[in-house]
A protein has these predicted regions:
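Surface-exposed loop/interface segments of Gram-negative outer-membrane beta-barrel transport/assembly proteins
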Residues: 1-51, 69-175
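Outer-membrane beta-barrel strand-turn architecture
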Residues: 60-64, 120-123
């Protein structure tokens, strides 16, 4: 901002950034960037992420030199992202026509390990080793939706406000 504008501009004059609510912002040069107050408050992206982790470990001494260990871990998560760009904005998405998008992801993973560990002293020689395996499972589901062609109603961020039919996609991935 300091580089692109002269000293005659007082940034405080642009704090009240609406000329016409939800349609036109107050700014000196609308050709390639927006009022910084407007960008900070109106061109938004948000992300909410929740995760729960769990872990369980058990071991059993089979003999003085042989031990079995079992481990299991799991996590479950959800994430919601939302992007909003007002009608008339040079910044963000939507090419001055407005834009709204949301994305929801959810998934979980489970990891199970089994380890058989041996440690044996025979005379002056010490032998140790282990044998183990793991089973892993992961699943992720994603729902994504966005407006197309802009927003019909300025300031109303909903797929119902899409000029053209909203674009949606759903995907699911799982593997072991």
């Amino acid at each position: 901002l300091l580089v692109w504008s002269g000293t005659e501009f007082d940034i405080r004059d642009y704090k009240n950034y609406w000329v016409k609510k939800d349609e036109q912002s107050n700014w000196m040069d609308r050709s390639w960037y927006d009022n910084p107050y407007y960008m900070a408050n109106e061109v938004t992206s948000s992300s909410n992420y929740d995760v729960i982790n769990a872990f369980l470990n058990a071991s059993y001494q089979i003999t003085p030199w042989l031990k079995l260990a079992l481990r299991s871990g799991a996590d479950v998560y959800t994430q919601k992202n939302e992007w909003k760009t007002p009608v008339g904005s040079v910044s963000g998405w939507g090419k001055k026509k407005g834009y709204y998008q949301f994305k929801r992801s959810s998934g979980f993973s489970i990891n199970n390990d089994a380890l058989l560990m041996a440690e044996k002293q025979v005379g002056n020689f010490k032998f140790d080793g282990f044998l183990g395996g793991t089973i892993y499972y992961f699943q992720n589901d994603v729902l994504n939706a966005q407006t197309s062609g802009g927003l019909i109603i300025p300031g109303y961020y909903s797929l119902n406000a899409s000029v053209d039919p909203a674009e949606t996609s759903k995907s699911s991935v799982s593997y072991t």
